[in-house]
Swiss-Prot record:
Annotated gene: RTM2
UniProt repeat feature B-, residue ranges: 163-176, 178-191, 193-205
Gene Ontology terms: cellular component: plasma membrane
SUPFAM superfamilies the record matches: HSP20-like chaperones
Source species of the chain: Arabidopsis thaliana (Mouse-ear cress)
Region (6 X 5 AA repeats A of L-E-E-[SKR]-[ERK]), start-end ranges: 129-220
Protein name, as recorded: Protein RESTRICTED TEV MOVEMENT 2
UniProt-annotated stretches for the region 3 X 14 AA repeats B of [IMA]-[RK]-K-L-Q-E-E-A-K-A-K-E-[EK]-[LA]: 163-206
Domain of life: Eukaryota
Deleted gene: phenotype: Susceptible to systemic infection by tobacco etch virus (TEV).
Length: 366
């Protein structure tokens, strides 16, 4: 049989080359001998097995070559009918595997007739044809198995590629959704922070505006208080001046002209008359001053309470109106007091100027 080589790859980086060794049959009277040329192979790199179901001998082997290549062979030989299976043995020498298959009945070829030799040759030829057929069938099956393995491997690779693609798409989708959620959460946080900042700024502006309004109210109340105190002081000064002038007029001695000369004699009657004449005006002024004092005290207490409410931001519009009314009432009372004081002073001046003239006329010397 001629040797034939064929390269096959498994896809894992290792390539196999199929080696078809040369074989030769020898028919001897005691046994049938099969010689197989396995040049390059060692005894440890081959294996011989007998298949009972098909009554065949399978010889396999493989050896490494260079560049990740391997050489292998798988040969099947049919065991002849007239053979003792239990006594089959082999030997390996000079790169030749020799398989000896002893016969059940020893035949003497030299004494066989021509027909027997022809039949033996025909049987040997038929055996070789059967062996060839079985070998081709075995190779065809092996090729089909190899193709099935390749197809299975290809399908497995396609399946793995599809799974990887689906996993990558799912991962990309998940990452996109995660980024979207993070962006939405970040936008919400920024919006909430912006809203909170705006609320804080609005609250601060409101606080500043309320504080400014409170300061203005306090300044107005302080100005009103200072104005009222100034007016009260002015009225008190006028009252003191009027009282001192009245006392001077009452205690001033009256000069009486007589024959012996003028004698200064006080006239309590005129003083009492003056006092009785202006008693009503004094009572009006005194009543106005008492009312004014009470109003000032009440206003001070009320002002303290209102100031306290302003500090606590509790003042109402009604209390603001009440404050304005109190200020107006105070101004009216001050004006009334000033008018009464002025009237009192004018009356005192006219009465004091008329009293000496009457005295001089009544005490004119004879």
């Amino acid at each position: 049989m001629a040797a034939r080589q064929q390269q096959k790859g498994t896809g894992f980086g290792v390539q196999y080359e199929d080696f078809v060794p040369k074989s030769e049959w020898k028919d001897q009277p005691e046994a049938t001998i099969l010689n197989i040329d396995l040049t390059g192979f060692a005894k440890e790199q081959m294996k011989v097995t007998y298949v009972h179901s098909s009554k065949m001998i399978r010889v396999t082997g493989e050896r490494p070559l260079a560049n990740r290549k391997w050489s292998r062979f798988n040969e099947v030989f049919t065991v002849p009918q007239n053979c003792l299976v239990d006594k089959i043995h082999g030997s390996f020498k000079n790169n030749v595997l020799t398989i000896t298959m002893p016969k059940e009945t020893i035949t003497k070829v030299a004494y066989l007739p021509e027909t027997s030799r022809t039949e033996a040759a025909a049987l040997e030829k038929a055996a070789k044809l059967e062996e060839k057929r079985l070998l081709e069938e075995s190779r065809r099956k092996e090729k089909e198995e190899e193709e099935a393995k390749q197809m299975k491997k290809q399908l497995l690779e396609e399946k793995e590629a599809l799974i990887r693609k689906l996993q990558e798409e799912a991962k990309a989708k998940e990452e996109a959704e995660m980024r979207k959620l993070q962006e939405e959460a970040k936008a919400k946080e920024e919006a909430a922070a912006k809203k909170l900042q705006e609320e804080i700024e609005a609250k601060e502006k409101l606080e500043e505006r309320k504080l400014e309004e409170r300061r203005l109210e306090e300044r107005k109340l302080e100005d009103m208080k200072l104005a009222e105190e100034a007016k009260l002081k002015k009225i008190q000064e006028r009252k003191s001046v009027d009282e001192s002038g009245e006392k001077e007029k009452i205690l001033k001695p009256e000069v009486v002209y007589t024959k012996s000369g003028h004698v200064a004699t006080p006239k309590p009657e005129s003083g009492s008359g003056l006092k009785s004449g202006f008693g009503g005006v004094g009572e009006v002024v005194k009543s106005a001053e008492e009312k004014l004092g009470n109003l000032v005290e009440k206003e001070k207490k009320m002002g303290k309470g209102i100031m306290e409410k302003i500090r606590r931001k509790e003042i109402t519009s009604e209390e603001k109106k009440l404050m304005m009314n109190v200020g107006v009432a105070a101004l009216v009372i001050f004006a009334l007091g000033a008018y009464v004081s002025y009237t009192f002073c004018s009356s005192s001046s006219s009465s004091s100027s008329s009293s000496p003239s009457s005295s001089s006329s009544s005490t004119k010397p004879e």
